[in-house]
């Protein structure tokens, strides 16, 4: 996989409806004040530099979904075609354990066929 550079400011949600939907579903997990605050958090996460506890992979479904999880914070996100956030939430510790760790969780997400 070629190395790609992600620049914060290039990963917003697809549209206002998607942003609102995901904020309603997950914004409280992050203490986001509003959907724009939540979107900025998602954008910063998906654009952050990789580090030893950040795990990332691409779905092999042809969508070019990039899935990543930070094992330190349990933050998880998916970006479509690299540039559009699909989702952003905090994964429960129990779910991470069930998949054998953060790397196992993100790999299972990349194996999904949706």
List where the protein language model places each region:
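Basic/aromatic recognition patch in beta-strand/loop cores that engages polyanionic ligands
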Residues: 56-82
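Compact soluble domain cores
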Residues: 1-65
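A short, surface-exposed interaction/processing loop segment used at functional sites
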Residues: 76-114
């Amino acid at each position: 996989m070629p190395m790609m550079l992600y620049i914060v400011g290039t990963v917003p949600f697809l549209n206002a409806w998607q942003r609102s939907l995901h904020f309603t579903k997950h914004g409280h997990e992050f203490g986001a004040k509003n959907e724009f605050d939540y979107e900025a958090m998602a954008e910063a996460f998906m654009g952050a530099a990789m580090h030893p506890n950040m795990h990332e992979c691409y779905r092999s479904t042809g969508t070019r979904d990039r899935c990543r999880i930070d094992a330190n914070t349990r933050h998880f996100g998916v970006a479509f075609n690299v540039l559009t956030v699909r989702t952003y939430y905090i994964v429960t510790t129990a779910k991470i354990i069930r998949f054998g760790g953060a790397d196992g969780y993100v790999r299972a997400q990349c194996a999904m066929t949706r």
